[in-house]
Amino acid sequence: MGKKISQLNRNELPYEGNELVAIVETAETRGGTLSSFMNYLSGAKYGTAQDSPIATPLANNFFQATQSVVGDLSASGKLVIGTSTVVGTLASIAGGTGNTASGACATIAGGESNTASSNSSHVGGGKSNAASGVCSIVGGGCGNTAGTGTCAVVGGGDTNTASGHTSSVLGGTTNVTSGGGSIIGGGLKNTASSNYSVIAGGCYNIAAGTSSAIAGGGNNRTTGNYSTVGGGLSANACCNYTAVVGGYNNKATDLYAGVVAGGSNTASGLSSFVGAGAANIASGNAGSVAVGGMSNAASGLSSFIGGGKSNAASGCGAV
């Protein structure tokens, strides 16, 4: 007479896998090894109509139905959520589709077709963004790149590029920060190409001088180091320590020269100054001044013109 299950000797752990287990198959009781059953169970798909396997912590499990976890979820390796790809060591993707985190410790929070390809790089979301520099960040937007330079940042916007070391583009469209530590706040097609250069906004502006700044406007240039353009259109501060506050087509072309406003004014002498008006020129060195008016020329050393039209101060200290 057979024994009841309660009468059998107790099992002993750990199992080696070659223990025999009884199973009914095609109306016949058959024996199989424990390892053969576990191989089947761990290789099956979860949530399908034909399979009802048991999950195992010793193999990769594939669930096709909704799962709920009560409590904490932790992982010592990679984390992938959504239809995305993780390649980098300890990289993680929290959601979205078509994302790739190939850098070590790289992360992507979500979005579509984003790439974090360098170590410790991060993409927050958006579409077709790329964080390719070490410790670089793209917050969101579309088609943005934080690459080449270490710790480069793009906050958002469209088709912006931060390639300089520790450079940043906060937003806007098609802006480029290629200088180390350079910053663009926003706008359209602005370029901060020199170290520590800054463009707050506007369009088609270029800050090419070291530590130069453009506040706004359009088609403005700072090619001198430590030069500044406040705004306006087509202004050029093209020598060191020069400034153009605003206006149209104004230029400061010698050291310490400045133009405040107006149109087509030029301060081309050392420490020269044009206040406003149109087509005025202060070309004399040692602080020549044309305050306003039209077509005036202060070409003498320390010369001065207050206003009027077509006046010339060509002698030393002429007024």
Give the positions of each predicted feature.
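Extracellular/surface-exposed low-complexity repeats and stalk/linker segments enriched in Gly/Pro
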Residues: 1-14
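Short, mixed charged/polar active-site loops
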Residues: 29-31
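Periodic small-residue-enriched repeat registers in elongated scaffold domains
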Residues: 70-319
